[in-house]
């Protein structure tokens, strides 16, 4: 029997469970998950203290702890030292933002894609490859990435993005997401924690959830990770690693200053953290800043993805890995992939060593600048963060409408944007903002049409 009476006692959650269902902690976790997904418990709700809930249900505190842990590993809850346990602000984002309720014709301004520029340099290389006498080898398994000259090409591309490395550090992955998954799978075990920005790349969140790796939001200061907050997390949150997007941060478009990169590098070296540096957007910058890996080469796994800067269909990423992590990450990539596509590895390497990749990048950059000029014209008077070479922008909303509400309303009118709720981490409060993909619309006319709709929505909010 409970020690105290709870008849008139205020509690944010008073579950009712069948104690005959064993194990009890799983039944309680299932009830908690359903109450979150069904909207009984809203994002940001603080749950009762574990001892209080244990008394109410007449259960051991350890049973409550296990149930909370199950939901925490699923990303439904966020526990903060000294503050308690909360329903994560992003707990419902996948449930209500990804439903298949889109109109038949929707102007795509949510997904991040480079512009639809000419892929002539790639086509030229591809035609040459398939007309070679031994063209069959491009369609076999092979050992793509083992060729030294292909690794030389990888080094050239990574150096172009701001990091000096060598071939003995290079691994090949089937895209950036694949490289992130392999890194977390090899360096983390279930329950381990990694630090991230309070809004971050959703693909990182899904991989972490799949592997039961917890992500801890680190507070920002002046639009970049606060060294003081990072140090606090190292001391009190027991984080094992860090995930960062230093350039064209997804979704907020911010850049880490060189000084901030140095300070973060000093902290990760001090606490021996591994760092995943997502360099998906480095090449968009004509004069890239030094990569974070430049300041902590023994700690940072530098991932140079090609889909955002060259072509979405190039599902390939070059990974510069510190020696201490190379063997476990290499094994993880092998177990996940066996190999990368010999066709894509060869095509990409030829495009790089011939310098044709510079033609592709410059073409993308010119088109992106033109598109951003349109964006600036239509959202003039509103706060739309980002630079002219960025392929997405971060639109801060006037009034009191949430990003999720704006996304839903925009979709009804024929435009897809992505709300801050898709990107928020744990119990961080989502900004009232949406991410707007500048280059996803197929034509300038389609982009302009989408911007006109967004402008009308913004004007209605003021």
Curated annotation (Swiss-Prot):
Classification via Gene3D superfamilies: Aspartate Aminotransferase, domain 1 (3.90.1150.10), Type I PLP-dependent aspartate aminotransferase-like (Major domain) (3.40.640.10), Winged helix-like DNA-binding domain superfamily/Winged helix DNA-binding domain (1.10.10.10)
Domain HTH gntR-type: 22-90
Co-factor requirement: pyridoxal 5'-phosphate
Modified residues (N6-(pyridoxal phosphate)lysine): 308
Superkingdom, taxonomy of origin: Bacteria
Keyword tags: Aminotransferase, DNA-binding, Pyridoxal phosphate, Transcription, Transcription regulation, Transferase
CDD domains noted in UniProt: AAT_like, WHTH_GntR
Signal peptide: none
GO molecular function annotation: DNA binding; DNA-binding transcription factor activity; pyridoxal phosphate binding; transaminase activity
SMART domains in the cross-refs: HTH_GNTR
Short name of any one Pfam family annotated for the protein: GntR
GO BP annotations listed: biosynthetic process
Feature: DNA-binding region: 50-69
Family that this chain belongs to: In the C-terminal section; belongs to the class-I pyridoxal-phosphate-dependent aminotransferase family.
Protein name: Uncharacterized HTH-type transcriptional regulator YdeF
Gene label: ydeF
